[in-house]
Amino acid sequence: MRELFPLLLQGTLVTIGIAACSTVLAIVMAFVATAAKLARWAPLRWLGNAYVEIFRGTSLLVQLFWFFFVLPLPPFRIEMTPFTVAIVGLGLHYGAYGSEILRGALRSVPGAQFEAALALNLSPLTRMRRIILPQAMINALPPATNLMIELLKGTSLV
């Protein structure tokens, strides 16, 4: 057992590293995709919807295989290390799910809060930062925590 401890420790550190980096990428992608899906410009909305539908509609294992085996082929020629493939695959996959969590949380804020922010003549950025996002984040925290636990469990595929 003692000779296996260094290997277990190394595997644990790799898992934590992949999970931490993937979580950061997933959070960034969730915010970007949510902003795209809620945009007024139709092509941006379409792009956000396409990202979410593609990454939620295919399994994580298929996506990881695609990133690792298909991207290095001639039309793309994008080669990544296994560590990078794990981070990108997990981050993009769970970012799509996180986008739906954020979108639902933003939609859960009562319309009266938007109207009150408009009545106070707050700028759109101030409205979002001071009034809407704090309430939405309270609603998004439990499912987002579950999603990050799923991401940690998803590292077993890499």
Q: What is each PLM-predicted segment?
A:
Residues M1-V158:
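Transmembrane alpha-helices and adjacent helix-loop boundaries
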